[in-house]
Amino acid sequence: MARGKAKEEGSWKKFIWNSEKKEFLGRTGGSWFKILLFYVIFYGCLAGIFIGTIQVMLLTISEFKPTYQDRVAPPGLTQIPQIQKTEISFRPNDPKSYEAYVLNIVRFLEKYKDSAQRDDMIFEDCGDVPSEPKERGDFNHERGERKVCRFKLEWLGNCSGLNDETYGYKEGKPCIIIKLNRVLGFKPKPPKNESLETYPVMKYNPNVLPVQCTGKRDEDKDKVGNVEYFGLGNSPGFPLQYYPYYGKLLQPKYLQPLLAVQFTNLTMDTEIRIECKAYGENIGYSEKDRFQGRFDVKIEVKS
């Protein structure tokens, strides 16, 4: 038994290193060199094919614009102040209750101050009235960075913060700022005039993507009260000269056009659900994404 065990151990040792044939694990040094060389060449070729494929693919991709945009969803519509539960609840006589909302608006509007838009090499005036989309060439680096349209805070009227630092919250007339999320190369198409006949509040303008805020539910519609809109040219929507957006590489200082909405006569001590919606031929809505082309927010002004 012991002799058989010793013989077995000897055979394993001999397999690991055979001193007679100079073999390690059954192969000579030359054999090991050849097999290692084979695998180095084999995996080197695989790596070369992989890297070559990636390089060819990268040649078809622009760093300035996606090659395929047919499946990009229409832009979302969002509001400031940005709140987690989309609920705004405050007491006009209690500054602490609306302090967070005001600070959120102040921080967002910092980049829209005149002092932040003085560089004429970056910013340019695009007019005080809505106009057609402003094309700035192809999506490449040949012309360098593209200029950006200025947007003046004064266009936001009562919601600009220039005359009322509480943006209406102190008076129980809250403001929200609405923006259309950035989508590279997107040019809004306003709805046709006849499609707005069911929305008497909205006036047709071929150079404005209109937005309307109303009560979400039937029981909310009579509680919303008067709604005032403030934007470029006093238009309730987004002017087209701020589009298309050329991306962070070509327009790092891009400013989205804003629309301010003020609710001046909300029913007190009532939670009101309000829906704000953009209207356009290429604006879509989705039940899976509640911010695609629209959003709703609950507002309660407590006494």
From Swiss-Prot:
Recorded name of the encoding gene: ATP1B1
Region (immunoglobulin-like): 191-303
Expression across tissues: Found in most tissues.
The protein's assembly and partners: The sodium/potassium-transporting ATPase is composed of a catalytic alpha subunit, an auxiliary non-catalytic beta subunit and an additional regulatory subunit. Interacts with catalytic subunit ATP12A. Interacts with regulatory subunit FXYD1. Interacts with regulatory subunit FXYD3. Interacts with NKAIN1, NKAIN2 and NKAIN4. Interacts with MLC1. Part of a complex containing MLC1, TRPV4, AQP4 and HEPACAM. Interacts with KIRREL3. Interacts with OBSCN (via protein kinase domain 1). Interacts with TRAF3 and TRAF6.
Highest taxon above the source species: Eukaryota
Protein name according to UniProt: Sodium/potassium-transporting ATPase subunit beta-1
Intrachain disulfide bonds: C126-C149, C159-C175, C213-C276
Topology of this chain in the membrane: Single-pass type II membrane protein
Transmembrane segments: 35-62
Localisation per UniProt entry: Cell membrane; Apical cell membrane; Cell membrane, Sarcolemma
Function summary: This is the non-catalytic component of the active enzyme, which catalyzes the hydrolysis of ATP coupled with the exchange of Na(+) and K(+) ions across the plasma membrane. The beta subunit regulates, through assembly of alpha/beta heterodimers, the number of sodium pumps transported to the plasma membrane. Plays a role in innate immunity by enhancing virus-triggered induction of interferons (IFNs) and interferon stimulated genes (ISGs). Mechanistically, enhances the ubiquitination of TRAF3 and TRAF6 as well as the phosphorylation of TAK1 and TBK1.
Native organism: Homo sapiens
Sample GO molecular function, one term: protein-macromolecule adaptor activity
